[in-house]
Amino acid sequence: MEISGRKALVLGGTSGIGLATASQLAGDGASVVAASRDPGKALDGLTSGIELHACDVLDRDALSGLFSDQAPFDILVCAATGGARAAGPFLEMELDAYQGSFAKLWGYTNSVRLGVQHMTEKGVIVLISGAPARKTKPGQVALSSVGGAVEAFCRALAPELAPRRINVVSPGIIDTPMFGSLGEERTNKLEGATAGHPIPRAGTADEVAQGVLFTICNDLFRQI
């Protein structure tokens, strides 16, 4: 799919990977709508050509209204986290916190279920997951469970959506606002998390966004 001239909706598009993706889509000539619960977060890093909207992916009425107002569109990127994920040993974890981690899955579920009917016939959907879906460490039970569910959801749904396409981009450790505010603690967290990697640094939101755009553009992925 050529991006120039297309219309794209990026949910969770005002911070981190979502904002980087929205910016690159706009830079390549797409008309972009970026939505999140707090669109004001994007103002400092906003690229021209991006329209901001307030929308919570867990609010189905608001989401339906957004899709209806913006229809038809060609590209849907789901990068909204749905909130924090629980971390730490499972046997010490509050079960409500573990259950709450699945807000990301429900946000994606709402977005695809309500959005696909407003997309063009050969539209493309990209979901953002994460490496713990396939390779996990102690303390990542929630991350692994949610990511695995997102990826299974995508695989099962792909045949139903054809000729529209749905794919997952699943990055490793990425330096985004989810790691907290700037400072030594943030730096230490990122260095510790990537110390054993062949390339011992965190990835960037822009690097993940490049992968998202590659997935959108490469029609070979209709066969995957």
Locate predicted features.
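Catalytic loop of short-chain dehydrogenase/reductase
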Residues: 89-111, 124-162, 173-174
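C-terminal substrate-recognition "lid" of short-chain dehydrogenase/reductases
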Residues: 201-224
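Hydrophobic structural elements of the Rossmann-like NAD(P)H-binding subdomain
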Residues: 77, 126-128, 166-169, 179
